[in-house]
Amino acid sequence: MRGFGDQNNSKKKKIQNRTSYKYKIINLALNLHAKGKIPEALKYYEYCLNQGFNDYRIFSNYGIILKNEGKIIKAESLIRKAIELKPDFVDSYLNLGNILQDLGNFKDAELCLRKAIELKPDYAEAHLNLGNILKHLGQLEDAKLSYHKAIELKPDLTSAYFSISTLQYSNEDKIWRDQLFSDEILNKKSKKGQVDIYFARANILHKEKKYDDSSKFLQLANNLKFDLNPFNYENFLKKSRTLLLEMDKKILKKIELKNSSENIFIVGMPRCGSTLLESIISMNNNVYALGEINILEESYLEYKESKKKKRIDELYIEKVNKKTQLNITTNKWLYNYRYAGIISDEIPNSKIIHCYRNPLDNILSLYRAHFTKGNQYSSSLVNCAKVYLEQEKIMSIYKNKFQSKIYNLNYDLLVSNPDKEIKSLISWLGWNWQDLYLSPHQNTRAIATRSSVEVRSPINSKSIGGWKNYREMLKPALEILTQSEKYRKLLS
């Protein structure tokens, strides 16, 4: 017969075995993640959560994976749980700040990053990310200080050099400039790190008006980037053509509701002047700028998945209402140009503004942009030209069919004669004129696009004709464009 002591020892052993098993599984999940075996790590993370293993590392790492997969809301919940379990885990504040930034919640993102810095003052990446958020909020001098600190703490942090290279440049920046152009900075750098450095060098040389040298680094950067993120033009083309065919199908009987919200869609190519346009329109206090948000395509896909049981307009408005209660919104997901037919046919009280500029200025701006995600074609001048022409062709078809619904906004004319062009736009929108539309640089909204610095300055025409400084580099794009009769004059 076993005594009470034996029973207690047996219980202790079971608990010890259970604890040992728990940490064995957790460590296995963490090791798989560290080795880049994400699908296998995911299975173990999910198992750990199902078993109730309250280890902050599980919640944190699982959240990071989901963020990278675009599952932002679930990722936010997991990272917050990690912070709850271990309030002094600095990486969780960094990751939560990045997630909140993706969600457009810049103020809370700033607080998270300041908390990370409070916990770990020498955390270079936290200073870098704080700088990015401050830049989006228009606090450019403070952003610069954060970038300086990041470089001071970690002189080989390549993304910090790119970020600071997008701000105003002066003689005070000589120290980090020398580091940026040193041979040592490229030692043992990944391809991604090299891309950051080459783009940063190109930006500085551009500011110094050394355009030939800037061209060399732009080509190095984009060639490497294209290897990392190849682009399939045929797949891109197929999607545009498929949606063009959808226009001919009558999806539903549209009902124009007098009291329904006003939905303004800004479409065109990236770097076409759309951020300036959105800043102008959102000077109206009754307008909410949704920014670059892909909720129209999400609504369309949900409509298709529901086998047409739901209405596209209802799905879209439902998503808008989660963002704002204001009655007028701008949606600046530029690739909605592919959906211009569906917008015109299916979204009540919708207006489309097609923003465009000189194709070579647009292509140069794309090639210089260094987008962190999407827009893979921007690393190839040939693909930039092809996509530009395809976008123009698609929009001409939609304009012929929905002429009254689509406004043409020429960026070059806008910045050359803002008073005339903005008054014309506001009149087309049916709004009363306010002089504040002429001062979009005073708009206090957060801007998370590549134009976040330029748009903080008064309207100017400095970028018009900038392509001429890069004429030799742009020859591949020029050859594609001039196959179209419309652009033959560019050769002269």
Q: What residue ranges belong to the model's regions?
A:
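Conserved phosphate-donor/acceptor-positioning beta-strand/loop module used by diverse small-molecule
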Residues: 343-366
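Short beta-strand segments
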Residues: 162, 266-268, 279, 291, ...
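Conserved nucleotide-binding/hydrolysis micro-motifs of P-loop NTPases
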Residues: 294-295, 357-362, 414-415
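Short, well-ordered alpha-helical microsegments
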Residues: 337-340, 418
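Alpha-helical solenoid repeat scaffolds of the TPR/TPR-like class and their adjacent stem/linker regions
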Residues: 1-323, 386, 488
